[in-house]
Design a protein with these regions (language model features):
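Active-site loop segments of alpha/beta catalytic cores
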Residues: 24, 33, 56-167
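Low-complexity, intrinsically disordered regions enriched in charged/polar residues
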Residues: 3, 48-51, 65, 98
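Short glycine-rich loop/turn motifs that provide flexible caps or phosphate-binding loops at active sites
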Residues: 2, 27, 147
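A contiguous, low-structure linker/loop signature
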Residues: 10-63, 77-84
Length: 167
């Protein structure tokens, strides 16, 4: 498989304060994790902490063709394997990180118009990304999405069909 090259407009930041490590992502979210307690983290400060920021939300440059040059070179090599590319997110994960998960779940009910607009922005960027991945020579995409816990989904099937199926 292959993924996107680094961004021209984003530089990853990482810093430690006491026992807590902070880092950012391309969307502008600030994450944190315990230095000696976890390898992952959780969103500490979401990029979209106020719906009034939605119109001006800075999107990652996943649709910059330069980010696909290494991928195209990789996929241009002869192989007998299926050429898969990693997609940098999906509508549910990216959107819930932008709002912070516990807020995002409330937003699904209380701020449906804003949620639909956010999902459209994220989906639009990911659609452009998929097209560029295809132009780079990928034959398929892979994305990771955590839609549930061990014994159930996080969102009921009716809401899922209404909110996410269109995207």
């Amino acid at each position: 498989g292959s993924g996107l090259s680094g961004s021209d407009i984003y530089r990853h930041r990482r810093w430690v304060e006491g026992e807590v490590e902070y880092y950012d992502d391309e969307w502008g979210n600030i994450w944190r994790r315990m230095v000696n307690g976890s390898t992952g983290g959780e969103v500490f400060k979401p990029a979209l902490d106020d719906w009034r920021k939605l119109d001006g939300l800075r999107m990652p440059d996943f649709d910059n063709p330069k980010r696909y040059e290494e991928m195209a070179a990789h996929f241009a090599q002869p192989t007998d394997r299926f050429k898969m590319a990693w997609l940098p997110g999906w509508v549910f994960a990216s959107s819930r990180y932008l709002r912070k998960m516990e807020i995002y779940f409330m937003d699904l009910i209380e701020y449906r118009e804003e949620i639909d607009c956010l999902h459209a922005k994220v989906t639009g960027l990911l659609e452009r990304t998929i097209r560029l991945i295809g132009k780079a020579g990928a034959e398929g995409v892979i994305f990771c999405e955590d839609l549930g816990v061990q014994d159930r989904v996080l969102i009921g099937p009716e809401m899922w069909r209404d909110v996410f199926k269109p995207h």
